[in-house]
């Protein structure tokens, strides 16, 4: 899926690990139909927003009720990091996969954001660090040798 080139990612990485097995065990065995529809609609909005560049939709599109509410209890300061990442100006923020890292979507080349994120970690969350990653719009390629 080609991603609109106006974004980068800031990843908040804690100094602890969370096993996928433990993260999966935190999830309920069954989900409510309403919750499934909620997440499916947001997944479609996320894909559409990332490909069209409608970045104003990313906060809503990164909303979740299937795994984040259950996994935040396993990620010390995780919910606070997501909230504060948005307060710093992230377009959206969420748990990366099973966790424990948190991903914030930011405007491409926003040096102010990464500086503020690093300062936030140093001052309030010393067990976390913030790292800026570029969006790879090509993905893995295989070339003939």
Predicted ranges, named:
Residues 1-5, 38-39, 86-87, 94-96:
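Solvent-exposed alpha-helices and their adjacent loops that cap or buttress functional pockets
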